[in-house]
Amino acid sequence: MEDRRIGVYVCNCGTNIAKVVDCDAVSDFAKKLPGVAVARSYKYMCSNPGQEMIIQDIRELSLDRVVVAACSPRMHEPTFRKALQTAGINPYFLEMANIREQCSWVHDDARAATDKALALAHAAVRRVVHHEPLEKRFVDMCPATLVLGGGIAGLTAALELSDAGQPVFLVEKDDHLGGNLARVDLTAPYLDSARDMLADRIRRVLESPKIEVLLRSTLQSLSGFVGNFRAEIRVGADGARTVDVGSVLVATGFREFDARRIEHYGYGRLPNVVTSFELERMLREGRILTRGGRVPKYFAMIHCVGSRNPEYHGYCSRVCCMTALKYGHEIKSALPGAYVYDLYIDMHAFGKGCEDFYRRTAEMKTMFLMYAKGTTPEIVPSGPDDDCEMLIKVHEVLSGEEIEVPADLVVLMVGMEAREDAADVAHLVSISQDKDGWFIESHPKLDPVATTTEGVFIAGTCQAPKGIPGSVAQAEAAAARILGKISRGKIEVDAVFAEVDETRCSGCRMCNELCPYAAIEYDAATKRSRVISAVCKACGCCVAACPSGAIQGRHFTDRQIFSQIEGVLEWASSQG
Amino acid sequence: MAIRANPRLVEELEHYGAEDVAKCYHCGNCSAVCPFSREPFLFPRKSMRYLQMGLEEKLLGNLEPWLCYYCGECSEECPREAEPGETMMSMRRWLTSRYDFTGISKLFYRSWKAELAAILLVALLTGAGFLLFGFRWGGGHLGVYAGEGAFLTTGAVHVFDWILGCVLAAFLGINCARMWWFSIGKDRTLRIPPLAYLRQAFLLPVHFFTQKRYAECGKKRPWAIHLALMLSYTTMLVLIMFFLHAMHSERTVWAAHGFGYLATIGLLGTSIYALRGRIRKEETHYKHSHETDWIFLILLVFVAGTGILQNVLYRVFHLDVAANVVYVVHMMGVVPMLGLEVPFSKWAHLAYRPLAMYFSELQAEAIRERERAVAAAGAPLPA
C-alpha cells in the first residue's frame, strides 16, 4: 500500500460543502493516511485552476491515484477523469467521495457531517489503491436509423437524417403518415394550416430514396446495442421485416385524454358536448353544427379537461390554452355572430407569439371566465325560454360570482396523455417512463432527447406534452445527435462492464434472466454465458447474482468494494 | 342563485365608448394605482369584470363608475391598454341612460344624429316661441333690449326659466330616485337606518361644491379645471334663476354683473380648454371622446359666447336690435342645453356624482355593519 502515491482533493463547492463540512479538517485528516502524498482543500475543484492543481500535482509529485472529495460522480467524474488523462495517467485511477449530496446537502449537524465526510474520504482512499488501469474500446456504427412514429416529430427527424444522406426506416402504426397533427385544422398562434405543413413533409418523405416508410407496422423486438441494433418489425397483418440500425428514435406521440372519465361533463351522454379533436374535425370540414343540425351561437371551451387535476393528470398539457384561443379565432371567422367563452384555470400563454395571440383573442371579445383549480364547471339543461342548448354554471373567480352562461356547443379541451402502448414501447427499446407514462430523457435540461439507453433517442410528445415547435426542435436535435454518432463512424464503449470467468461459469443462466439490458448471451455450444461488453451498463446485477462467483464487474471488483467498506468501518471503530 | 352572463353587454357598451374593455386580463394594476379606490369599493377592476361578463344587474346597481373622476392614472398603468378610465366613463354614460326612465338618454347616447336632431328641433321651437312672443304677445319692440317696452320682458323670461327648471328637476328627480332604487333600494341585504340618510346628507353639498375626491388625484389641474367649470355654471344658474332682473336691467349692476363676467370667463375658459384638450388628446382623460362630449362642449361654448355677446352688444355698443337677436339665439342654445343635456345626457352627472358619493357612503356603512354582524355571529361564545 505504501508504494502508492495518492492525491486527495477536497472541494468546498463555494459554500455548498464548506458551510457544513469542515473541508480543511478533511484534507488534514487525509494527509495522514497511508499512501497519501498530498491532500488539499480548494474552493472549486471542478474549475480550471482546480483541475490544473490536480494535473500539476500528478506530474510534479508523481501521483498514481487520485481521490476527489466533492459532489456526486454523476456530476463531475468525467471532468476529473479527463484531468487524470491529461496529466498522463489512466483515467480510472480516480475515485470520488460524495461529500456534497451525501453530507453537506442532507445534514444540518456540521460535526456529524464532517465525521461522515472523513469516513467517506477514508473509504475512497482505501478503495482507490486497488483501482486498475482500464482502456476504452470502439465498435462500428451502423448509419441506418429506425424512427418509430410518423407524426410531425418522426417525419422531421426522418427528413433531417435522409437529407444528410443516411438511410431511415420510418415505422408507422397507422395506415397513413401525419400522426395527431393530421387531425388538426389551423395551428396557434399564427393560424397556419396544419395540413399544408404536413403535406409538404409527407411528400418529401415519400419521395426520398433514403427513407423506407413502413405503414401499419409495429416494432416487435429490438436487440443489440448502440451502433449495432437489430429490429424485428411486423408489417401489416402478417408481413415481417428485420432491419439493422445504429440508432433508434422513438417519436410515438400522445393520445388525448378520454373525456368520458370526467362524468359530470356528460361527454358521450350530452349530444352537444364535444372534444377539441371533434371540433377540429368540424372546422376542417367547414360544417359547425349542433347534433340537432342547428348553427350554434354560443361556444364554451372548457380548459384543463384531464389536465392539472390530481384526480386525472397533475401536469399541464401545454397546448390546450392556445388551441382554445385558436378556436375563438376560427369560430368567429366562420360565424361572425357567435359568442365564445373560455372557462379556464390559468391562461398558459408562454411561447413565441402566444401572449400576443392571447391579447388579440381578448380583443375579439372572447369572454374569459376563470374557474378555481379543484372545481369544475357544471353543465345543466337550458330552460324553455332560453335560446341555447345548455347552461354552464361556474363559480367565476375574478368576479367572485356564481354565474351561468348560455351554451350551444361545449368543447372539452382534452389534455395529452401517454399512449396506451407506451409501456410496451419503453420495454422494447429499454427506456423508462415517468409516473405519468412519458418517456424519460437522459437529463431534463442538458440532455433532453437522449435516453439512458445509448443509441435510443426520444422526440415529440412521447417525452412530454408539447407543441409543434417543441416537437420539431426535438426531432431535429435527435437527428443531429444521431448524425454526430454516424459521422464519428465508431462508438466508444465504456471500459466499465461485467466479465464472466468462463472457467468458473456453470452455465446456470441465472444472469441471462436477470440482466435488465439483455447484455448477456448464452453460448449453447460451450454452455457458458458471455457479457456483450458494449451493451453492459455495469449495473452489477449479474455480479451479485452469480452463484459461482464467476462474474466480476470491472472497476467494481470485490476487492475494491470491500476495501471501501472496510475504510468506513475502520474509521468508525477508530472513533470508538 | 346564479347570475346569467350576457355576452352582448360588451357590444352594447361599445355604443357608450367602451371599446377596449375586452383587453383587460385582471392584473389589478388599475385598482392598485387608483387614488380613490378603497374598501369596500375597489375599482375599476371589478366593474370591468362585471362588464366583460355582462352581469347587467350587478352593473346597474354599481355606484363605482360615479366614484371615479377619471384622472386617467389607471389607463396609463394598464399593461393591456384596456383603458379602464374610459371604460368607467362609458359605464357612467350607460348608467345615465339606464337611470333615465324615458329612454331618451339611451337614444341620444346610441345615436349622435338623434341627439343633434333633437337639439335642433328644440332650438327651432324655442326660437319660434320667443319670436312669436316678442312680436305678437309681449307688446315690446325689437329695438328695445331692456326696461320699458323690451322685446323679451324679464318677467316673462323668468317665468319661463322657472317652468323649465321645474320640469327638468322633475325628470332628474325621478332618475335620481331610480338610481337609489337600483343601487340601494333593491338590495335586500343592505339595511340602512333612516337616520343615516340624514346624518350623511351633508356629503351632497360637500361633494357638489368641492369635488374633494377629485382633488385626491396626483394631478391637480383636471380637478381645478373641473371645479372652475362647475362653480361658473352654478354661479350663472343662480344669477339667472334669482337675479334675472338685475342681469337684464338697463344699468350695469356690478353686484350681479361682476359675478356674471367671472362666470362667463370661467365657462368659456374651461370649455375651450377642454375642447382644445380633446382635439390634442395629450391628457389621458381627453384621449377618447364620445360624440356626446363634443356636443356638450360645443353647446356650452355657444351658450356662453352668445350670452356674453348680447351683453356686450347692448352695454358697450348700445345695439338693441342686435342684442335682442342674439338673445333669442342664446335662448335657442340655452333651452336645448339645459332641457336635453341635464336630464338625458352628460350634465346629469351634476346630480348623479354627489348622489353616488352619498349613497356609497351609506352602502359602505351598511356593508361594514353587516360584516360586524357576521363576525359577531361567527365568534365563539364566551366560556
Briefly describe each language-model feature range.
Chain B
Residues 1-65, 350, 358, 364-365, ...:
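Ferredoxin-type iron-sulfur electron-transfer modules and their immediate structural context
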Residues 14-20, 61, 153-156, 214-224, ...:
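Membrane-interfacial loop-to-transmembrane-helix junctions in polytopic alpha-helical membrane proteins
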Residues 91, 117-132, 158-177, 225-245, ...:
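Hydrophobic cores of alpha-helical transmembrane segments in multi-pass integral membrane proteins
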Residues 29, 33, 73, 77, ...:
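Hydrophobic alpha-helical transmembrane segments of multi-pass small-molecule transporters/permeases
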Residues 194-209, 302, 361-383:
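Cytosolic juxtamembrane regulatory segments of multi-pass membrane proteins
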Residues 1-2, 92, 96, 383:
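Flexible metal-binding regulatory segments at protein termini and peripheral loops
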Residues 23-26, 60-63, 67-70, 261-264, ...:
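Secondary-structure capping and boundary motifs in well-ordered enzyme cores
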